[in-house]
Each structure stands twice: as structure tokens, then as C-alpha cells.
Amino acid sequence: RISAKHYGIPSTGNGRRESFRQMPIPRMRATYMEAGNVTEEEMISTVKKGIYASSFTNGQVQIGAGDFTFFVKDGYLIENGKLTQPIKDINIIGNGPRALADITMVGNNYKMDNGTWTCGKDGQSCPVTCGMPSALVSKLTVGGEN
């Protein structure tokens, strides 16, 4: 409630804690995106130069501003609509609300994650879930390049 009041928004009940030993703090718990109507292959075919991220690791978000950074654990370079060479350990930087506005296509391949994600905050770690289809984001900073 304190954070919601600080940001001037309604409370959403996202106060969670790792165990009874800690105070609850606001944090993520579940992230989902509804499936669209295009295949992954159709999305990839529209990209002149970009990356296809197969999996992510080590993300951070600046609450309030919405700025984020994630590392692509593994994926592929996209060149002229085709997956070419493998990539890994690439940094992606962006802003959450802006990235959502820059989604140009959403795939029909919705799936739930394997459940290995956690939300780390103030020395606590809580399990979180996410599920989504592939999504084409037109503008993000990748490895320091826009």
C-alpha cells in the first residue's frame, strides 16, 4: 500500500516476501501476454537485421521509470528474414512501456515458462511465473547498439 500511495496508483496486492522472516515488499509475481495470429517464421521473415532470443537470464528493472536490462542466454542473429549465426550473452536494454508500444507482431505460439524464474529484491528471492508467445519488438538497444 505504501508504494502504491507513493506512485499515486491503486494497490494491486503484489506485496510478497521470501519467508515469514522478512517484511513484504512490492514485486512481480506473474507476467503473461495473450497469443497473436502469426507464426514465428512469419515474424522472422519480416526482419532485415535483428536478434531472435531463445532464452533470457539475469534481468533487472528500475521500478517507476520502467527501464530494464536482460541478458539473452542464447539465440540467433536474424539477417534478411533468416536465422543465421548463434548468439549468446547479449545485453538488451529498454523501457517496459515503450517496448510494449513497439511490439509490431505477436505469435500464435503461446507457452508457459518452465518455472525457474525468481524475483530478487532487497536480498529476497521469490518464485515468479511467465507465459507468452513470440513477440516482435521493433526498437530495443542490443549490446549497446540501437
Predicted regions and their residues:
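N-terminal small-residue-enriched
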Residues: 1-146
